[in-house]
UniProtKB/Swiss-Prot annotation:
Organism: Hyphomonas neptunium (strain ATCC 15444)
Family statement: Belongs to the GcvP family. N-terminal subunit subfamily.
Source taxonomy: Bacteria, Pseudomonadati, Pseudomonadota, Alphaproteobacteria, Hyphomonadales
Pfam families: GDC-P
Reactions catalysed according to its record: N(6)-[(R)-lipoyl]-L-lysyl-[glycine-cleavage complex H protein] + glycine + H(+) = N(6)-[(R)-S(8)-aminomethyldihydrolipoyl]-L-lysyl-[glycine-cleavage complex H protein] + CO2
Domain of life, per lineage: Bacteria
Quaternary structure annotation from Swiss-Prot or TrEMBL: The glycine cleavage system is composed of four proteins: P, T, L and H. In this organism, the P 'protein' is a heterodimer of two subunits.
Function as written in the Swiss-Prot or TrEMBL entry: The glycine cleavage system catalyzes the degradation of glycine. The P protein binds the alpha-amino group of glycine through its pyridoxal phosphate cofactor; CO(2) is released and the remaining methylamine moiety is then transferred to the lipoamide cofactor of the H protein.
GO molecular function: glycine dehydrogenase (decarboxylating) activity
Name this polypeptide is given: Probable glycine dehydrogenase (decarboxylating) subunit 1
Keywords: Oxidoreductase
Keyword Oxidoreductase: yes
Keyword Disulfide bond: no
GO biological process, one term: nucleoside metabolic process
Amino acid sequence: MRYLPLTPEDRANMLATIGAKSVDDFYTDVPDAARLKGKIAGLPDHQGELAVERHLTKLAAKNRSASSGPFFVGAGAYKHHVPATVDMIIQRSEFLTTYTPYQPEIAQGTLQTLFEFQTQVASLTAMDVANASMYDGSTSCAEAAVMAARVTRRKKIILSGGLHPHYAAATRLLAEAQGLTVVQLPVAIDGEGELAKAVDGETACVIGQSPNVFGTVTDLSAVADAAHGKGALLVSVFTEAVSLGLVTPPGEMGADIAAGEGQSIGNGLNFGGPYVGLFSCREKLVRQMPGRLCGETVDADGKRGFVLTLSTREQHIRRDKATSNICTNSGLCALAFTSHMTLLGGKGLKQLAELNHEAAIELADALGAVKGVEILTPRFFNEFAIRTPMDAEAVLAMLDEAGVVGGVRASRLFPGDHLGDVILVAATECTTADDIAAYTDALKEII
């Protein structure tokens, strides 16, 4: 329904109820010099709805969307096709809310979808149990570090040199606020070789990423063995959930906790959010797992039902005993993830992953054939790093003028790490042969 403003009689009754003579009485404590009188400078007069739509459309046309031309940006957020069915499902009135389903008697539909979400995430990561989502991948990573410290009763967190810097920053923020020590290893494009060597008897967990921020796919099994040999945990992080359709999942590499981003499945780029954090772990750690957990039970009549269980958030118990203070979370984004995963199925996810990998191989072959361009990532899924003979920022600016969004300069993520000539490039199932040709042709003209 359209907005219906208050009538003068409504306002008079409201003022009389609270004992005020006029609306100005509310602002008696605001100095007169600080009050705005008259029109706001630059604000146009009101217009009809059609005129406003035209004006906003004109403003929006100044933007370049991810679908308006060749687009090769990744670095933690990826452009994938989202079936129209997903949006149809999440816009149903029964689901269109992020509020917590505290009352199971009236929220069985929402609780069941969360249960299915957990089942899918646990299967995807090859773990025993998953929670009902986190805010995003970076908060999942941070919560995993703090959880590991609780489990091991140690205070040292080791971050790999291939961990996404935004994830590292979120982890430092949360961990250091709780008195933990965070050790960041030097930036590493190729694998996690130094991670296993860094573990000692004081380490709570090591956090590795595969594919890492440079796209390198790494077997973390040796890191898991090294961590477990010292009584520490391995946290396996991922930013591209579609990769788990092909690469070895965290659980099969010996990880104790898997934390990552689910945006790639069912969710658009959304200007950087909202996204949906994925979090799973071994069953023996479930009581220390942050966030919500939806469980299956039976009601008084013996019928299957779903409820929130093991609620150890600070809203339920004492803060010092709580496993997290995550509040109303990414439930709607989790539903989008679940809907897309259900439509894909296991075979569909594998096929989607294969399309991504094939597109990336074609892109790497094409870019690698350009004189002066070097492919730096040895083993990749759908993203890799290239080195150009020119400054990366200048190259990307000229590509932009040619209508190609060429990727993310590595120096934006790692300032001062001698990566000024490195660009992170991603390809997905949305990348066409024409897109690759446009990139290659433009790059040849530039360098």
